[in-house]
C-alpha cells in the first residue's frame, strides 16, 4: 500500500520519480504527487487519480536533479488533492512524503501544533509541521527530524526535503518497507526495488527505527540516538525486463502463464545433488519436531495455507492450524508446548502477519517465513525462510504466488515426512512435474475459459463456488479471484454446507461452479450440483480426468489428486480474468485494493 520514490543525482529527477511511481502502481493508490528541487526552490505537483493524471499537471519544462514522490492509499482523510502527498510545512521550508500510519498524530497535534492551521486531514502533515516547529525552536534539520521520529508511534517510511538544504534527502523507516539504491553519481530511495531498477540494482536494506542522510555521493545510516551504522549493500537478482508485461495485455495473464515455469523452478531449486527434495536441515527438523504448526496468512496466502495444512497433516503427521493473521493478533488460541509458526506472504511485508510474528517471537517461539521477496521484513525477522522463486508478481490478484506457496508447502511436508520416517506413497518430484505440464496445457486453453466467462458471468451479480475436501479450499480462492477483479459478489462454500443456509440464495440463472477432483467425495459434490440445478442454478462442473462425466463443462488433465489444487485453480484464475475483462474492469489494478498491505 502506498509507495515512495526519492532521487538525488545528475539526471532528470521528475522523470525518474514518475517512472518509479509507475512501477509502484501495483501496490494500490488513489492519488499521487512529486516534489522536485532546483535553484529556484521546491516545486510540488500532485493530483487525485492515476500517475497518468499526475503527468498532466507536472511542468514538463522544469529541470531538477533531486526529488521525492509518493503514491497514496487513503488511511486518514479521503482521496483528494489536499490529502495527496507531498505535504509542506506552514512556512514552506519542509516537504515530506510518508507511508504508514502514525497512531498518535492527534496527540502530537494537540501538544505541538496548537497555533498551526493544518491544510489536510492526514497524519502525515502533522509530522512535517512538528519538524518545522522543532527547527523554529533552534534545532538543526537532522536533530529536528530525529527528535520527531522518537515521538512517532506506528509505522512509517518517510522522505523529507529541506528548502534550505536541497542537496539532501532525509529518510527514515519503521515497520514500513524502504530501501536505498546506490549509484556512482546519484542515490535513490524507494519502497520497492522495482521502482529503482531503471537506474540501479545495488541496494542497502534499512532496519526499523533507522534514519538515513542521502546526498548524490553519500548515504549515512544512523539510529535514533544519532550513532552511525555501517551496512553492506547487495546486488538484486531482478532485471528490469522481469517487471515488464512484454506482449501481454495484462500482468495477471502473464503471471498466470508463468505458473508452469515457476513450478519447474521450485522443483529444481529444492532438489539436492541426488535429485531428492530437500530444504535446509534446520527447517526440516523444525517442522518434523513441532508438536503443532500454526500457519498464518491473509487472503490468497491464507487459502494456500489451507491446502498446505492437508499436506503437512497427511504426509508428515504433524497437526496444523491455519489462522487469518488479522484475527490471530487479537484472539490468540491456546498454544501447544513446541509450536512452529509458518508465515505465508508474497511480499514479506504484510503488516497483519508481521504483528503476529512480533507476538510469537516475544513468546520465544520459532518462525518460518515462506515469501517471494528475499530480504523482506518477515524474512529478516523470522528464524527461517523459504523462497517461492516466482519472480515479481505485479498484478494485485495473486496467481503464481498462490500456486508457488502450495508447491513449497508440499515440498516442506514431504521433506518433514521423510525426516519422520514416513513414506508419502508417491514421487513428489515426478508428480509436481506432471502438474506443471498440466498447468501449461490449461494455459493454452484460454479460448475455452473466455467462453465460460462469457456464458456464465458477463451479466451476473453473484456467483458461487462449491467443492469438498481440497476442492473446497480451491473454491474459496477461485471466489476471491472473481470478486476482487470483476466485482461480482462471489463466495466459495463447502458443498455439504449448501443445505445449511446458502442454498436460499440460489435463484434462476445463478452461476454455480463446482470442482470435482477428489474421488472419495465425487458423488457427494455431484449430488450438491443436482440440488442447486433443481433450484434454477446455471451449473458448471470442472472435473479431473478419470472422474469426469459426460455433462461436465470442463475436464482437467490427469494429475495426482493431492496436487489437483495446483491445476484446478488455473481455470478459475482465467475465468475470473476474462469475466473482469468483459465487464470493463481494470484487471491489474482493481478498485480499493493494494498488492502489498503494509498497514494493519
From Swiss-Prot:
Main location as per UniProt: cytoplasm
Presence of the UniProt keyword Repeat in the record: yes
InterPro entries documented for this protein: GATase_2_dom, GFAT, GFAT_N, GlmS/AgaS_SIS, GlmS/FrlB_SIS, Ntn_hydrolases_N, SIS_dom, SIS_dom_sf
Designated name of the protein: Glutamine--fructose-6-phosphate aminotransferase [isomerizing]
Annotated GO biological process: carbohydrate metabolic process; fructose 6-phosphate metabolic process; protein N-linked glycosylation; UDP-N-acetylglucosamine metabolic process
Subunit comment: Homodimer.
Domain SIS, residue spans: 283-422, 452-590
UniProt function note: Catalyzes the first step in hexosamine metabolism, converting fructose-6P into glucosamine-6P using glutamine as a nitrogen source.
Encoding gene (name): glmS
Recorded superkingdom: Bacteria
Organism, as annotated: Bacillus spizizenii (strain ATCC 23059 / NRRL B-14472 / W23) (Bacillus subtilis subsp. spizizenii)
Amino acid at each position: 500500500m502506498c509507495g515512495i520514490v526519492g532521487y538525488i543525482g545528475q539526471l532528470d529527477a521528475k522523470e525518474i520519480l514518475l517512472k518509479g511511481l509507475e512501477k509502484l502502481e501495483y501496490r494500490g493508490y488513489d492519488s499521487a504527487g512529486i516534489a522536485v528541487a532546483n535553484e529556484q526552490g521546491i516545486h510540488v505537483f500532485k493530483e487525485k487519480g492515476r500517475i497518468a493524471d499526475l503527468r498532466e499537471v507536472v511542468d514538463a519544462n522544469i529541470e531538477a536533479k533531486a526529488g521525492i514522490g509518493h503514491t497514496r492509499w487513503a488511511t486518514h482523510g479521503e482521496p483528494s488533492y489536499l490529502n495527496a502527498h507531498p505535504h509542506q510545512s506552514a512556512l514552506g521550508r519542509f516537504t515530506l512524503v510518508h507511508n504508514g500510519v502514525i497512531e498518535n498524530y492527534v496527540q502530537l497535534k494537540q501538544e505541538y501544533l496548537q497555533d498551526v492551521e493544518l491544510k489536510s486531514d492526514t497524519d502525515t502533515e502533522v509530522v512535517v509541521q512538528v519538524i518545522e516547529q522543532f527547527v523554529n525552536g533552534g534545532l538543526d534539520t537532522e536533530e529536528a527530524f530525529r527528535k520527531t521520529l522518537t515521538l512517532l508511534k506506528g509505522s512509517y517510511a518517510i522522505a523529507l526535503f529541506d528548502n534550505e538544504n536541497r542537496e539532501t534527502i532525509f529518510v527514515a523507516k519503521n515497520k514500513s518497507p524502504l530501501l536505498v539504491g546506490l549509484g556512482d553519481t546519484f542515490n535513490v530511495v524507494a519502497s520497492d526495488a522495482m521502482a529503482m531498477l531503471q537506474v540501479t540494482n545495488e541496494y542497502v536494506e534499512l532496519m526499523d527505527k533507522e534514519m538515513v542522510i542521502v546526498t548524490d555521493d553519500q548515504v549515512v545510516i544512523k539510529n535514533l540516538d544519532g550513532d552511525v551504522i555501517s551496512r553492506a549493500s547487495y546486488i538484486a537478482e531482478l532485471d528490469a525486463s522481469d517487471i515488464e508485461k512484454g506482449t501481454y495485455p495484462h500482468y495477471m495473464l502473464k503471471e498466470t502463464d508463468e505458473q508452469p515455469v515457476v513450478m519447474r523452478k521450485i522443483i529444481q531449486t529444492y532438489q539436492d545433488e541426488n535429485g531428492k527434495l530437500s530444504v535446509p536441515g534446520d527447517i526440516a527438523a523444525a517442522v518434523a519436531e513441532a508438536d503443532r504448526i500454526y500457519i498464518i496468512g491473509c487472503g490468497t496466502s491464507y487459502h494456500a495455507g489451507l491446502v498446505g495444512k492437508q499436506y503437512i497433516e497427511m504426509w508428515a503427521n504433524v497437526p496444523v492450524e491455519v489462522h487469518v493473521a488479522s484475527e490471530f493478533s487479537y484472539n490468540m488460541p491456546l498454544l501447544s508446548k513446541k509450536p512452529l509458526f509458518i508465515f505465508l506472504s508474497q511480499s514479506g511485508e504484510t503488516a497483519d502477519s508481521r504483528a503476529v510474528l512480533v507476538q510469537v517471537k516475544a513468546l520465544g517461539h520459532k518462525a518460518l517465513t515462506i515469501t517471494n521477496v528475499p530480504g523482506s521484513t518477515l524474512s529478516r525477522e523470522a528464524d527461517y525462510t523459504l523462497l517461492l522463486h516466482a519472480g515479481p508478481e505485479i498484478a494485485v490478484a495473486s496467481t503464481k504466488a498462490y500456486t508457488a506457496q502450495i508447491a513449497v508447502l508440499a515440498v516442506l511436508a514431504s521433506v518433514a515426512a521423510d525426516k519422520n520416517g514416513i513414506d508419502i506413497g508417491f514421487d513428489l518430484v515426478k508428480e509436481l512435474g506432471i502438474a506443471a505440464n498440466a498447468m501449461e496445457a490449461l494455459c493454452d486453453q484460454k479460448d475455452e475459459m473466455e467462453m465460460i466467462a462469457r456464458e456464465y458471468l458477463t451479466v451476473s451479480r453473484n456467483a458461487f463456488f462449491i467443492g469438498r475436501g481440497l476442492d473446497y479450499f480451491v473454491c474459496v480462492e477461485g471466489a476471491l479471484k472473481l470478486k476482487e477483479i470483476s466485482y461480482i459478489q462471489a463466495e466459495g462454500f463447502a458443498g455439504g454446507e449448501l443445505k445449511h443456509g446458502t442454498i436460499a440464495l440460489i435463484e434462476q440463472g445463478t452461476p454455480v461452479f463446482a470442482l470435482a477432483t477428489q474421488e472419495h467425495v465425487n458423488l457427494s459434490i455431484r449430488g450438491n450440483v443436482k440440488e442447486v440445478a433443481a433450484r434454477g442454478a446455471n451449473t458448471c462442473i470442472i472435473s479431473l480426468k478419470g472422474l469426469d462425466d459426460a455433462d461436465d463443462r470442463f475436464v482437467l488433465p490427469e494429475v495426482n489428486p493431492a496436487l489437483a489444487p495446483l491445476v484446478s485453480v488455473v481455470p478459475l484464475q482465467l475465468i475470473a480474468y476474462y469475466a473482469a475483462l468483459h465487464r470493463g474492469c481494470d484487471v491489474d489494478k482493481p478498485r480499493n485494493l493494494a498488492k502489498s498491505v503494509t498497514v494493519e
